[in-house]
């Protein structure tokens, strides 16, 4: 991980994103905010944060890969993390959007997260078709 980049941890949900901004040289995020999960709001955030180097990080989930694709179209580095491989400290059971976003930023900076390959739209469509067929047959 590039220690000179700002890491932006994101907890992505259908309606909004909680964003934790961890600049270089800081141990904790300096800002945590919630934005709408809409194209214009994401573009505004990305434009604001890409004045320097930034990497956007979020866990794969039911919202898919659209946020990663949009950030990529804007010229940003965006990585999707495997949630099953995210380290969890014993006793750390309280889950909030803010804590999840902060944790992603810190763990990515520390090099403790596993990045996944984002499927193409065609691969994703084929996967959806296979799953729908399996559901219909079952």
Spans of features found by a protein language model:
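Phosphate- and other anionic-substrate recognition elements at nucleic-acid/protein interfaces
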Residues: 1-138
């Amino acid at each position: 991980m590039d220690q000179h980049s700002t890491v932006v941890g994101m907890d992505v949900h259908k309606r909004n994103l909680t964003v934790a901004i961890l600049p270089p040289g800081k141990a904790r995020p300096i800002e945590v905010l919630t934005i709408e999960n809409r194209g214009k709001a994401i573009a505004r955030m990305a434009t604001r944060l890409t004045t320097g180097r930034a990497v956007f990080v979020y866990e794969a989930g039911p919202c898919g890969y659209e946020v990663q694709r949009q950030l990529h179209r804007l010229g940003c580095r965006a990585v999707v993390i495997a949630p099953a491989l995210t380290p969890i400290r014993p006793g750390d059971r309280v889950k909030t959007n803010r804590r999840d976003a902060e944790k992603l930023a810190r763990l990515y900076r520390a090099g403790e997260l596993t990045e996944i390959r984002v499927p193409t739209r065609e691969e994703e469509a084929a996967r959806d078709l296979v799953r729908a067929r399996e559901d219909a047959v079952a």
